[in-house]
């Protein structure tokens, strides 16, 4: 039987070989190619699967290590918080449990990192080592963990803020022996931890955590101070916004703020019409050249000049003693233009000279013109009693009297518009003015109210005795005028009475309406107009965002905007429409 089976197996193998040999070469090559393609596809699928698994493993390892770093960071913060609370309240049982929990996990983490449970590990050093070891992996594929880079930067900045000594222990800021090398060692801590991340595990047992409460408190204050300095350094341009305007972020805004003044010099320095010379001035250097009056502000100067004939009025206006704004004595140059060395307006002693040899109120002054004011007009112009006495005394001794000129005729307004009711006496005194006015009124009233008697006394006697009847006669022109005048006076009085009543009613009605409007205005909210105002920073953003920014005349644009600037508690603001017009003009 065994021989039969062996013979059958040999026959079957021989038959297969015979069938394979019977295939043509083309069919044989196709089968070989199919087998190779199948094997290649299998290997590729296997490799892709392995790579995917490896990537997942790497991701999980990174997540685990980052979680460990974050957990240790939170534990350190919790420890600092507990120690900080000791200063404000006594320690409780819960605080003690928290500290024991932190110590236990800190020791376990140190044992896992070193391969044994001996020695305590510095938490800050472990943070640096973990961040350095993860830096290479995270940098290879940053798309996997987008938050890893941010966490690593935060941890590095947290570790850099601490002061380390040579052995890696935390040093209080008040320790003078090690504070001199704190900055250099802190800068080298990061550099040394990154390249030696593999060998740092052997030195972790030498680093110990300093748990002294006093040193931790000092360290916390130092961390807060350094954090403020770092935040201030990262604010952009390094400007101290607490001491200066927040709009001083560029030279453009600094110049534009001069329109409203700065904190150092709050006086506006915008361009004004005073910087331009007045019409009719010349720039030559002769004796009639304009006098330059320096203002206390600095650069602003006012150029004024008299005419070629030396007009006394213009010289008076351009007198430095007259326009001076200082309380000091006048300089010799100023005395040359003044009358007798008298102090000008704003200078000490100006009020004393006002009653004496004043350049404005003296009859000999160029500004005094009797032909314009009139000789008897002086007392009505200057109402001060002291000035009136002085002027009257000077008029008696120096002025020329014209007996045929009455100032009341030239200026009837000062006599209450009674020009047409005055008497023909032009030389009355001021004291008799009221009496003359009363007499003139009586004469006029008698004239308008008294009937004109007849010239024929006999006719009047006959009519009075009843012997002759009075015939109706035509009204004379004078009688007609008198009646019309009386009617007009009566009608005007009635009209005034009615108008006064209407005005009283209207005033009462207007008062009631005003009260109603006031009540409505109390509940009305005034809309804000700040939406249309742009600050300097917003204007500067518009300028710098323009593609033709390099071709813009910044100085010209700033000067144009200064003329339209408005002042607010936040600095300079400009209307958005004005800004857009100026930008279109300079960017076209």
From Swiss-Prot:
Region ranges (c-CRD): 536-567
Single GO MF descriptor: DNA-binding transcription activator activity, RNA polymerase II-specific
Compositional bias per record (Polar residues), positions renumbered to this chain: 164-174, 190-217
Chain spans, region Transcription activation 2: 376-477
Ranges where the bZIP domain occurs: 25-88
Gene Ontology BP term (one): response to singlet oxygen
Entry keywords, A to Z: DNA-binding, Nucleus, Transcription, Transcription regulation
Region span, Transcription activation 1: 189-327
Gene3D superfamilies hit by this protein: 1.20.5.170, YAP1 redox domain. Chain B
Disruption phenotype: Leads to decreased resistance to hydrogen peroxide, 4-nitroquinoline-N-oxide (4-NQO), benomyl, and cadmium chloride.
UniProt superkingdom: Eukaryota
A GO-annotated cellular component: nucleus
Pfam families the UniProt entry points to: PAP1
Region span, n-CRD: 253-265
Domain notes: Contains two cysteine rich domains (CRD), referred to as the N- and C-terminal CRD's, n-CRD and c-CRD, respectively. A nuclear export signal is embedded in the c-CRD, with which the nuclear export protein CRM1/exportin 1 interacts only in the absence of disulfide bonds (or otherwise oxidized cysteines) within the c-CRD or between the c-CRD and the n-CRD.
Protein name stated in the entry: bZip transcription factor GAP1
Record lineage: Eukaryota, Fungi, Dikarya, Ascomycota, Saccharomycotina
């Amino acid at each position: 039987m065994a021989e039969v089976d062996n013979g059958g197996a040999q026959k079957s193998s021989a038959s297969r070989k015979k069938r394979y040999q019977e295939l043509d070469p083309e069919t044989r090559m196709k089968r070989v190619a199919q087998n190779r393609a199948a094997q290649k596809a299998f290997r590729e699928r296997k490799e892709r699967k392995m790579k995917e698994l490896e990537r997942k493993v790497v991701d999980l390892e990174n997540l685990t290590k980052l979680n460990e770093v974050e957990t240790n960071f939170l534990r350190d913060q919790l420890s600092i918080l507990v120690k900080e609370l000791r200063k404000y309240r006594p320690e409780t049982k819960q605080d003690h449990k928290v500290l024991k929990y932190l110590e236990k996990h800190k020791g376990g983490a140190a044992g896992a990192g070193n391969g044994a449970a001996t020695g305590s590990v510095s938490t800050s050093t472990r943070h640096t080592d973990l961040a350095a070891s993860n830096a290479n992996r995270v940098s290879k594929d940053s798309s996997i963990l987008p938050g890893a880079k941010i966490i690593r930067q935060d941890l590095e900045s947290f570790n850099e803020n601490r002061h380390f000594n040579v052995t890696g222990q935390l040093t209080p800021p008040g320790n003078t022996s090690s504070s001199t090398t704190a900055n250099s060692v802190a800068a080298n801590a990061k550099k040394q931890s990154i390249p030696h991340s593999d060998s740092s595990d052997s030195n972790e047992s030498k680093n110990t955590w300093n748990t002294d409460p006093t040193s931790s408190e000092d360290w916390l204050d130092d961390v807060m101070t350094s954090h403020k300095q770092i935040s201030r350094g990262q604010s952009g341009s390094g400007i101290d916004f607490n001491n200066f305007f927040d709009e001083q972020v560029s030279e453009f805004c600094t110049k534009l703020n001069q329109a409203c003044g700065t904190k150092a010099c709050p006086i506006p320095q915008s361009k004004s019409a005073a910087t331009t010379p007045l019409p009719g001035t010349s720039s030559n250097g002769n004796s009639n050249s304009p006098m330059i009056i320096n203002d206390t502000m600095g650069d602003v100067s006012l150029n004024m000049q008299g005419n070629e004939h030396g007009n006394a009025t213009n010289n008076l206006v351009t007198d430095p003693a007259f326009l001076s704004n200082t309380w000091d004595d006048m300089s010799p140059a100023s005395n040359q233009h003044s009358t007798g060395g008298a102090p000008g307006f704003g200078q000490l002693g100006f009020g004393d000279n006002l009653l004496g040899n004043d350049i404005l109120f003296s009859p000999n002054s160029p500004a005094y013109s009797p032909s314009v004011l009139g000789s008897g007009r002086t007392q009505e112009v200057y109402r001060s009693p002291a000035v009136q006495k002085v002027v009257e005394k000077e008029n008696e001794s120096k002025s020329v009297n014209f007996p045929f000129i009455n100032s009341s005729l030239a200026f009837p307004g000062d006599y209450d518009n009674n020009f047409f009711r005055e008497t023909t006496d032009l030389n009355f005194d001021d004291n008799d003015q009221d009496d003359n006015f009363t007499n003139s009124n009586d004469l006029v009233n008698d004239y308008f109210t008294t009937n004109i008697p007849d010239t024929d006394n006999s006719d009047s006697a006959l009519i009075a005795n009843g012997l002759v009847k009075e015939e109706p006669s035509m009204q004379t022109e004078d009688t007609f005028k008198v009646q019309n005048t009386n009617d007009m006076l009566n009608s005007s009085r009635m009209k005034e009475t009615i108008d006064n009543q209407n005005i009283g009613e209207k005033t009462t009605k207007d008062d009631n309406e005003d009260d109603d409007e006031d009540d409505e205005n109390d509940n009305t909210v005034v809309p804000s107009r700040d939406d249309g105002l742009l600050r300097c920073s917003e204007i500067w953003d518009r300028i710098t965002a323009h593609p033709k920014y390099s071709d813009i005349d910044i100085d010209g644009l700033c000067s144009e905007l200064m003329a339209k600037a408005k002042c607010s508690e936040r600095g300079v603001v400009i209307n958005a429409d004005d800004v857009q017009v100026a930008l279109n003009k300079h960017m076209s």
